Amino acid sequence: MSGMEDKKLGRYERQTMLPEIRTGGQERLRAARVLVVGTGGLGSPVSLYLAGAGIGHIGLVDDDAVSTTNLHRQVLYAEAEVGLPKVVLAARRLRALNSDVDVKPFACRLTPDNAAGMIQDYDIV
């Protein structure tokens, strides 16, 4: 087994059974770097699934705080977190879901001024 230990690989057993993934594919997922822009309605579930699938490096960009109006559709957040920064909470939740994932929060908006510097470290946005 090249790279991933049996214990860690066991977590992904269901997806590594797929001929398209196998162990080599899971190792590629572990090496992947994904930047999620926005941790709201779409970014919230997307980031959960990326962490659950074993994407090794996830960047999160968001400058917003949780509001009551978010709670019915943004599954990363809870009532007690209203007013807190989404990106900080999202990073914490993803790390709790999968401690093998490196999560980097960016508490800002993606703008023309910062996009190049932020995106350069990721394989996909």
Report each predicted region and the residues it spans.
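Adenine nucleotide-associated cytosolic modules
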Residues: 1-125
